[in-house]
Amino acid sequence: MLKWEYITTPLLLHKETAILNNWGSEGWELVQIVTGPEGGLVAFFKRPVQAS
């Protein structure tokens, strides 16, 4: 059964593309972007857990 790990990170204005590309280059897939509790954007990512 495939297992996933998740991470959240704030998206800084005017640096969204760089942040998304950085996480994507490490194998993270963007799941969703939402407004955070303090008004900024928060990105949710997932990727398969590596077999140990």
Which residues fall in each region the model found?
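Terminus-proximal functional modules
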Residues: M1-S52
